[in-house]
């Protein structure tokens, strides 16, 4: 895993986004951001029915994929999402921990393909396919 300043700055920027902090997002392994994230299913993440809001899982699956992709980006590159498809497989109740891992399937010159899995109590609760465009940083 790269240990350079750009990598560290990108991870710090992701962790510092107020929305991510509000949701309680944390790295699964602070020494390896590509290992994914986790968050508690608490009041800010619930829908009116008292279950995990789908928008939260969509957003954080995208974040996990970006964290997995960072190590594949050059210092002059950034990645933006242009396609995100999520299948919600089962509802998630309050007071659960959701772990999300992202995996880079293929990094091309201009496009990166990833997948993410959200897991609660050992069961996959959501699966995503994420496509990001690789663009010049700036």
Spell out what each predicted region is.
Residues 1-138:
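Terminal targeting signals and extreme-terminal segments of soluble enzymes
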